[in-house]
Regions:
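Flexible loop/turn connectors
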Residues: 231-338
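Short acidic/polar active-site loop segments enriched in Thr and Asp
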Residues: 14, 60, 118, 176-177, ...
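Hinge/beta->alpha junction and helix N-cap segments in small-molecule ligand-binding domains
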Residues: 67-76, 95-103, 155-165, 181-231, ...
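Residue-level detector of anion-binding/catalytic polar loops
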Residues: 46, 86-91, 141, 176, ...
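Alpha-helical recognition/docking segments in bacterial nutrient-uptake
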Residues: 2-5, 61-168, 172, 239
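N-terminal helix-turn-helix DNA-binding module of bacterial transcription factors
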Residues: 1-60, 73, 205, 337
Length: 338
């Protein structure tokens, strides 16, 4: 097997220059980098990660901390992070964090602090001031996805605004009897997405003069949760809404399945709109608010690498970036039936 010394000898450079050329660290001309990289590839040389870590002080490993791995939104973000890290030559270490306080302390006191990760990406998790300071003191930058965290570079969508726009689309089609299928307000993640989306729904209904009782149904945020709620809410024709504003595409798809099971036409009898951009939504003709989920992972990786490269934000306004969300109109929404 070829060694670094073999590559350096063939390239006509010193061993240290060859190391810098392959690691991307230090002052080496572009021509030399290309020549050394080509020779290393030709000779089948693969740099030792341990040796590179000793030379650069970096592990080329970034941690992603998430509360879920099996929900569609989270798995899509994780896929986006992984693809971007592989493209940049980095490894991914994945930690699933529950609401167990002992587990959280172990994660921040040991795994993220003492283990060899260069940066941390927090997915829909609020990082406390003490946790931020602890990682910052060790030169481990943090990037957040899902909400604002003081002192941390974050990317998020405005859930209240998105839900308001979602609801306004159905109102513009003449709907007045709308119900929000949302997440349980008693069991929310750190950034209270469920509450934000319910507020946005009610903002739109109040502005249009359509506020009503029994406008909210708490559901499990899943396809089965949407289906079960749909079967309950849509079964009574005397009190049936003309539209459902769903907290996610998965819930919307479940509600659509319930409507079909009950013999209802979508959108003839019932209009349904979701949030996310789930690929099944396109196949089913679901109108939705597309939040470009996988791109969020790639954006977070790009920011983490920029911070590792020495970039810093000048103030808190620079640290929080609102991401675009686009209304995608498909077959599941239409004018209210007269």
């Amino acid at each position: 097997m070829a060694t670094l010394a073999d590559v350096a000898r063939k390239a006509g450079v010193s061993k240290s220059t060859a190391s810098r050329a392959l690691s991307g660290h230090g002052s080496v001309s572009l021509a030399t980098k290309k020549r050394v990289a080509a020779i290393a590839k030709e000779m089948g040389f693969v740099a030792s990660s341990a040796a590179e870590s000793l030379a650069t002080g970096r592990s080329k490993n970034i941690a992603l901390v998430t509360p879920f791995v099996n929900r569609w939104f989270y798995s899509e973000v994780i896929d986006g992070v992984e693809a971007a890290l592989i493209g940049a030559g980095y490894d991914l270490t994945l930690y699933r964090l529950t609401d167990n306080e002992e587990q959280r302390r172990a994660l921040f006191d040991y795994f993220l602090v003492r283990k060899g990760v260069d940066a941390v990406i927090a997915l829909t998790l609020y990082i406390t001031d003490d946790e931020v300071a602890r990682l910052d003191s060790l030169g481990k930058p943090i990037v957040g996805i899902g909400g604002k965290i003081p002192g941390v570079s974050t990317f998020f969508i405005d859930d209240r605004v998105v839900a308001r726009r979602q609801t306004e689309h159905l109102i513009s089609l003449g709907h007045t009897r709308l119900v929000h299928f949302g997440g349980d307000l008693e069991h929310q993640l750190d950034f209270e997405v469920h509450a934000g989306r319910l507020k946005g729904f009610r903002d739109a209904m109040e502005r249009a003069g359509h506020s009503r009782d029994n406008d909210f149904v708490a559901v499990d945020v899943s396809t089965s949760g949407g289906y079960e709620a749909g079967m309950r809410v849509l079964a009574d024709p005397t009190n049936r809404p003309t539209g459902i504003v769903a907290v996610s595409d998965e819930v919307a798809i479940g509600a659509m399945m319930a409507a079909y099971r009950l013999g209802l036409s979508v959108p003839g009898d019932l209009s349904i709109i979701g949030i996310d951009g789930h690929p099944l939504g396109e196949a089913l003709g679901l109108t939705t608010m597309v939040q470009h989920v996988s791109k969020q992972g790639a954006i977070a990786v790009s920011q983490a690498l920029a911070l590792l490269g020495g970039m810093s934000a000048s103030d808190d306004d620079d640290l929080a970036m609102e991401l675009p969300v686009d209304l995608k109109i498909r077959r599941s929404t239409g004018p209210v039936s007269v």
